């Protein structure tokens, strides 16, 4: 497949024109024109790039790419090495950030909800492109049971604050990655629990004082599944050779 055609298909699938982001979505570093082998991963780290080189990949597709708003534009140091490796090996780099978080089928929130048994997702914000969402568990569970479920699914213990929440959890809000700032909105919307990737000092106070269970399950861990699903969709729809590579990150 042509590299620009691949960008067009991905942009269309993820409706990138509908979402304001603080990083460019699409083809970020241009490589060879024809693509057959794609490596997908959460972040365009040097380790992922080196793996793609070893696999003779034509492209890398990630959730966390480059050129973030307010980022130093100079191509040097760690950033220079990464981009140089891509250019020397003629590898295309595609990045999709918020459009992949919010996609109703392939998105990080949607895939994590599916894995945790949370259904009927609705926007938490008053917007069709709300970043956080909420849904319901078919069978209510205790906070301890929900923490165990998260650990079983993500293969890591979540950081939890479950001191003053309700006895049973049914209504759950999700914002994968660094979404801890949405806890107040989740509490205001009557959610029993809020799950995200990261935690800040003030997050715990918000959880305690507003009576909502809080689970921080890892930025990387909560965002594996959207990019993996996007790659699987490409392989199924267009016959491309796509491999997901998980570069472990405890954060």
Question: Where are the regions that the model predicts?
Answer:
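Active-site catalytic microenvironments in core metabolic enzymes, especially phosphate/sugar-handling
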Residues: 1-251
């Amino acid at each position: 497949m042509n590299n620009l055609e691949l960008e067009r298909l991905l942009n269309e699938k993820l409706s990138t024109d509908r979402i304001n982001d603080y990083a460019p979505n699409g083809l970020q570093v241009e490589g060879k024109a024809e693509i057959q082998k794609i490596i997908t991963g959460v972040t365009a780290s040097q380790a992922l790039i080196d793996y793609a080189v070893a696999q003779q990949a034509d492209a890398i597709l990630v959730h966390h790419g480059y050129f973030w708003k307010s980022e130093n534009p100079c191509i040097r140091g760690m950033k220079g090495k990464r981009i140089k490796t891509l250019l020397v090996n003629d590898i295309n780099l595609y990045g999709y950030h918020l459009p992949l978080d919010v996609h109703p089928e392939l998105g990080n929130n949607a895939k994590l909800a599916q894995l945790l048994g949370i259904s009927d997702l609705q926007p938490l914000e008053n917007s069709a492109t709300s970043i956080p969402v909420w849904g319901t568990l078919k069978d209510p569970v205790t906070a301890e049971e929900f923490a165990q479920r998260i650990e079983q699914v993500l293969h890591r213990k979540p950081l939890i604050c479950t001191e003053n929440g309700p006895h049973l959890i049914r209504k759950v809000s999700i914002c994968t990655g660094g979404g801890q700032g949405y806890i107040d909105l989740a509490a205001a919307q009557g959610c029993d629990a809020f799950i995200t990737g990261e935690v800040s000092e003030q997050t715990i106070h918000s959880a305690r004082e507003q009576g909502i269970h809080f689970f921080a399950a890892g930025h990387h861990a909560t965002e594996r599944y959207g990019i993996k699903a996007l790659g699987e969709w490409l392989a199924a729809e267009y016959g491309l050779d796509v491999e997901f590579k998980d570069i472990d990150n405890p954060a």
